[in-house]
Amino acid sequence: MADLLSSLKNLSHSSGVYQYFDKNHQLLYIGKAKNLKKRIKSYFSVRNNEITPNYRTSLRIQMMVKQIAFLETILVENEQDALILENSLIKQLKPKYNILLRDDKTYPYIYMDFSTDFPIPLITRKILKQPGVKYFGPFTSGAKDILDSLYELLPLVQKKNCIKDKKACMFYQIERCKAPCENKITKEEYLKIAKECLEMIENKDKLIKELELKMERLSNNLRFEEALIYRDRIAKIQKIAPFTCMDLAKLYDLDIFAFYGKGNKAVLVKMFMRGGKIISSAFEKIHSLNGFDTDEAMKQAIINHYQSHLPLMPEQILLNACSNETLKELQEFISHQYSKKIALSIPKKGDKLALIEIAMKNAQEIFSQEKTSNEDLILEEARSLFKLECMPYRVEIFDTSHHANSQCVGGMVVYENHEFQKNSYRRYHLKGSNEYTQMSELLTRRALDFAKEPPPNLWVIDGGRVQLNIALEILKSSGSFVEVIAISKEKRDSKAYRSKGGAKDIIHTASDTFKLLPSDKRLQWVQKLRDESHRYAINFHRSTKLKNMKQIALLKEKGIGEASVKKLLDYFGSFEAIEKASEQEKNAVLKKRI
């Protein structure tokens, strides 16, 4: 506590980021301040060299302050830099008392470039700095379904480089294009098609009506499989914005953010209004054992969404709640990012308040659907048994696979919201010579990626205590707070023992070892995670081995024997690198002419 007292006396008045740590050097909280000394001192009350929490702060903050053993600060040029650095560090290090919003992706837009002779609809996530470009969006989902539908319903130029070919392609043969490349349609005639395309993008009902007519024609012609494709596409497009019944007389362009939380769960809803209509929406479920701070959640949501330059900015950003101080900070952040003033406000009356109420109603509805399930109970029991500080809402599970230390690969699977998130799975080619160095490489590469993809609550390692300790060391060096458990087979005579009809599994934590009955739900939950990572790694290993066998066969056809292939692989590292290497480079490795 003496170190903390000394730090409080020697704080800078500069802008910067502060980090609080407990006695075990675990990161508790990251914050930012225009004046570090003033902000940090607001957490504490100091009398007679005794430090206690400031009673004016929330119970959540007071609970955190009681655990603070020391602090660190990072000085920056100004408050804007502090705001951006704070957000980046929270995502990378995942402090115990900060809220982590994972949805920081940039949503796609559909655009048409009318400066070209024959404009076509395309998808982008970036600003195209040229005149004549018209944007639509953002689309939280369904953008590709809209695009595919437009190309199938209208005789548009089907590919960006079609006009350059100067020759009609198969799309002209099947009447999906008018072949402007051969001047079979004038620019003026094509412009009418492009304008019809615009109308369908702007009016989802018109697009759906055309799709329904096509689906009906296919069905009448007994082309049921194709009709089903259109049925599914219609369903996806209808889900793009469940609030399309809202159509304001005023042509507002608004982004709307609503946060609703209770206990250890919360929901953030985002709605995007263009031309007085809600065109898309999204939500994110958030969990925290330490409660929520609306200011912190809103700050992270706004920075995540607007830190990349977006093609279309709203006239105004509406929030359901936020302190005046944070509102001002965010206003300055937006103005600085986009070099223009875009108002952020908390509506108190009128149709904008009605929009916030609709967003809140949806947040509350989504929240109410998040009922406690058997899986929640198992997670809570697992947390209690393994003495985890956080609920394992998001879990990353790791396994490696190899054959005689060749074709070494690793896999990471992700489990969140009670299901495997296959879009988040990752595969790795590894160079390690044994299972320990391979696991170390796999986990190190994942930890190095924390800045881009925030860490989870829990790592599950397929391995024993050695692999567990490897994981703990890597996480310690990364500075991120992630808890770890490992699962391994029981060993007899230093070998993994597998009994006929089922293997005996042991679960390892940093401080304990658990041998649970096969019927134990907590063991079964960990086994389910381990088995999926094992399946994923094994499948990747098999596909890698098959690919390598084919590439070896191709090299043999060129007169390169297995011993030479091994030399080349040892030197270049992969078959892809061998293919890219020049004959001279390969000759030098083999010391003979190939």
From Swiss-Prot:
Signal sequence, renumbered to the chain: none
A molecular function GO annotation: DNA binding
GO cellular component terms, semicolon-separated: cytoplasm; excinuclease repair complex
Record-linked InterPro entries: GIY-YIG_endonuc (IPR000305), GIY-YIG_endonuc_sf (IPR035901), GIY-YIG_UvrC_Cho (IPR047296), RuvA_2-like (IPR010994), UVR_dom (IPR001943), UVR_dom_sf (IPR036876), UvrABC_protein_C (IPR050066), UvrC (IPR004791)
Record keywords: Cytoplasm, DNA damage, DNA excision, DNA repair, Excision nuclease, SOS response
Limits of the GIY-YIG domain: 13-99
Main subcellular localisation: cytoplasm
Origin superkingdom: Bacteria
Listed GO biological process terms: nucleotide-excision repair; SOS response
Gene3D superfamilies linked: 5' to 3' exonuclease, C-terminal subdomain, GIY-YIG endonuclease, UVR domain, UvrC, RNAse H endonuclease domain
Record flagged with keyword Chaperone: no
UVR domain location: 205-240
Subcellular location: Cytoplasm
NCBIfam families: uvrC
Family: Belongs to the UvrC family.
Role description: The UvrABC repair system catalyzes the recognition and processing of DNA lesions. UvrC both incises the 5' and 3' sides of the lesion. The N-terminal half is responsible for the 3' incision and the C-terminal half is responsible for the 5' incision.
Quaternary data: Interacts with UvrB in an incision complex.
Record-linked HAMAP family: UvrC
Protein name in the entry: UvrABC system protein C
Gene name linked to the record: uvrC
